[in-house]
Swiss-Prot record:
Protein's recorded name: Protein Z-dependent protease inhibitor
More info: Heparin acts as an important cofactor, producing 20 to 100-fold accelerations of SERPINA10 reactions with factor Xa and factor XIa.
Region (Heparin-binding): 136-153
Gene responsible for this protein: SERPINA10
Spans annotated as Disordered: 24-65
Keyword RNA-binding part of the UniProt annotation: no
One cellular component term from this protein's GO annotations in UniProt: extracellular space
PTM text: Phosphorylated by FAM20C in the extracellular medium.
Alphabetized GO MF terms: heparin binding; serine-type endopeptidase inhibitor activity
Site (Essential for interaction with PROZ): 261, 314
Stretch forming the signal peptide: 1-21
Keyword Acyltransferase: no
Biased composition (Basic and acidic residues): 56-65
Amino acid sequence: MKVVPSLLLSVLLAQVWLVPGLAPSPQSPETPAPQNQTSRVVQAPKEEEEDEQEASEEKASEEEKAWLMASRQQLAKETSNFGFSLLRKISMRHDGNMVFSPFGMSLAMTGLMLGATGPTETQIKRGLHLQALKPTKPGLLPSLFKGLRETLSRNLELGLTQGSFAFIHKDFDVKETFFNLSKRYFDTECVPMNFRNASQAKRLMNHYINKETRGKIPKLFDEINPETKLILVDYILFKGKWLTPFDPVFTEVDTFHLDKYKTIKVPMMYGAGKFASTFDKNFRCHVLKLPYQGNATMLVVLMEKMGDHLALEDYLTTDLVETWLRNMKTRNMEVFFPKFKLDQKYEMHELLRQMGIRRIFSPFADLSELSATGRNLQVSRVLQRTVIEVDERGTEAVAGILSEITAYSMPPVIKVDRPFHFMIYEETSGMLLFLGRVVNPTLL
């Protein structure tokens, strides 16, 4: 029996031009040293002082951990809500297949925020829904993303790889603090480039991205403006393996309903076993949980009535998803799920403008933390390309999964044979890694 892997790749690009952008860099958070008590008339013995200091430090450490955990949860929640807002903006222009990475977008824009200050920085925070975190320490946001990145990369079962490039014009003066902070928080690799030779720069950058994405995106750049000074590229590669595998032996060509009148034939995978699901009576939709190895999950949202999938998008929030998860019950089920591959590219700067992030794309951008010429810089382009592939390729899985269905019981069936939404979460952090919609599984 084969494990079904899901390959998901997201690449985000931010391009900076010399035309109009800031101030001292954020410092890493420091915990103030505990102060000695001086109000006592009699000096406490040295051992007692040490005990008190240890207790104080231990209490501070516990408070720090609790605060950090709450901040991470808030970050995940706000990133998800940002993702749902972005979904609605994309949906106004595209009613077909869709996939993008809210996590990747937030990660890249937070990295860019290291070079911004004043209203430029504030707009990015507000647009990403991150102003609610109200950081009490400098460098909080990048520190949270750094911790999350490191946690995800240590989880080898998850199969998530993330990286960042800064392609910099050879004579462009980037501040050393921006270099150092980008490396510290986002492990950014800086690559000098001659953008005046646009064709050579395009070829070299495509080579880098092709190599890092393992050939999944051989050509990210179609053209390069010779006036470009800096291009930031973030990529996320996710190759997940289902915890409950689909056996390719049972994959058959079946009918998928595009709408009330049109159907197509697609390879439909079949799985039987214990699945968690719920039915939302308010929205009349099935929500199915398909777990990956490494503590990640794909949520599949399938409307009961054909054609209602777009209407649901207006109501998607983190609170709604949390309600679905709380109401889920695990039971023996049969699941039919189509194989599909999506390859989507979006010019995100226009959508981000609509979400209130405007200044960084204008001559009023303040990027003076990025470069000494920061008030003559603006970001010209933010592009995200995401690829997802769900099929039966993979490693051997444990046999006998079908034995969980008893001979005398007809299990419930969920057949994903019409347009649906999917969300891929990392469960420990609650971070929404990818969000998408499949209207036609045979189209990219």
